[in-house]
From Swiss-Prot:
GO terms for biological process: axoneme assembly; flagellated sperm motility. Residues 164-222 are annotated as: Disordered. The gene is SPACA9. The record marks 117, 119 as: Essential for interaction with INCA1. GO terms for cellular component: acrosomal vesicle; axonemal microtubule; axonemal microtubule doublet inner sheath; ciliary basal body; ciliary base; cytoplasmic microtubule; nucleus; sperm flagellum. Microtubule inner protein component of sperm flagellar doublet microtubules. Interacts with CABP1 and CALR. Interacts with INCA1. Interacts with microtubules. Keywords: Cell projection, Cilium, Cytoplasm, Cytoplasmic vesicle, Cytoskeleton, Flagellum, Nucleus. It is found in: Cytoplasm; Cytoplasmic vesicle, Secretory vesicle, Acrosome; Cytoplasm, Cytoskeleton, Cilium basal body; Cytoplasm, Cytoskeleton, Flagellum axoneme. This is Sperm acrosome-associated protein 9. It comes from Homo sapiens (Human). PANTHER family: SPERM ACROSOME-ASSOCIATED PROTEIN 9. GO terms for molecular function: calcium-dependent protein binding; microtubule binding.
């Protein structure tokens, strides 16, 4: 749990930097829409932003801010997977996690999303922009962050035995793999030793000098 909380805090810090460049972000999207001759459709998915950056972005400044947005979305997607490893989930936490996974999907339609108070990202847009173009894409990250904070709040109320650190399964697997190699090497030694012992035992049971003829008493027969 501590690991996912720290990961979420790290993403929040990156988002604060991104939020300061919201006007640069929407301007970059506007430039890409012009280059793509796609001025009618709203920005409706993460995949659309990805496509704009790869095919219609001609400015290094625009590319940098678009990449910042996509990187944050990618980290949120990875954090969803980490959440699944913390505990098996309850109906409440599973519902929150499913919402997060849906929102962070590359193809999910986010055009109708609107972040409300205390978020003010939509307020920084003009009415036309907020309604028709960028209201959804600027609302995406803060809405996901809110859901993830709510997930953590519910998860922290669960019994301690239900929770497990995200790093534990990985650490356990690594320690198991690390221990298996020397154990296997050590385990082969007794078998080799036993094999040698069996060979020695069989050899020791053979009569010595078996190639010599049987002993006969002097001048007599057996």
């Amino acid at each position: 749990m501590n690991e996912v909380k720290e990961s979420l805090r790290s993403i929040e810090q990156k988002y604060k930097l991104f939020q300061q460049q919201q006007l640069t972000f929407t301007a970059a999207l506007e430039h890409c829409r012009e280059n793509a001759h796609d001025k009618i459709r709203p920005i409706s998915s993460i995949g659309q932003v990805q496509s704009y950056m790869e095919h219609y972005c001609n400015s290094s400044t625009d590319r940098r801010v678009l990449l910042m947005f996509l990187d944050i979305c990618s980290e949120l997607n990875k954090l969803c997977q980490h959440f699944e490893a913390v505990h098996s989930g309850t109906p409440v936490t599973n519902n929150l996690l499913e919402k997060c996974k849906t929102l962070v999907s590359q193809s999910n339609d986010l055009s109708s999303l609107r972040a409300k108070y205390p978020h003010d990202v939509v307020n920084h847009l003009s009415c036309d922009e907020a309604r028709n173009h960028y209201g959804g894409v600027v609302s995406l990250i803060p809405l996901i962050l809110d859901l993830m904070k709510e997930w953590i709040a519910h998860s922290e109320k669960l019994p301690r035995k239900v929770l497990q650190h995200v790093s534990e399964p990985q650490a356990h697997q690594e320690s198991t793999r690390g221990a298996a190699r020397p154990a296997q090497a050590i385990g082969t030694q007794p078998r080799a030793t036993k094999h040698k012992c069996r060979q020695l035992t069989k050899a020791s049971l053979k009569p010595r000098g078996c190639s010599k003829p049987p002993w006969r008493p002097p001048g007599g027969k057996l």
